[in-house]
Amino acid sequence: MLHMNNTELLEQITRTIVDRFHPRRIILFGSQARGEANSESDLDLFIEMETQARPPERVVEVSSIFGLRPWSLDVVVFTPDEVQRLRRINGTLVSVIEAEGKVLYERPSF
């Protein structure tokens, strides 16, 4: 459960992920990003980062850094190569998130 106006919590979660994993991007998606969240809505985050872990392990790795929490968190983690490949295919989760999500963090490119 997450209160829709809890910007401070969202910023804290984003900072924690950035400090620990140094992702390329973090995007909020789902009902929270669309402004349709209610008291039962969870927090859906897309994370683009370099990793050698398999997809299920990526989710556990990110989710576990928050331990027990009073809010629900769902994450999807893709590598930059996966994002490049999947963004070109209409209807994939990546293409939908990029079109409809709210960017919370994007690493500056030099």
PLM regions: where:
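Catalytic core of pol beta-like nucleotidyltransferases
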Residues: 1-25, 34-39, 50-110
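Glycine-rich beta-strand-to-loop/alpha-helix junction loops that act as flexible
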Residues: 29-31
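Short, conserved active-site loops that position catalytic residues or coordinate cofactors/metal ions
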Residues: 41-43
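Short hydrophobic/aromatic beta-strand micro-patches
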Residues: 46-48
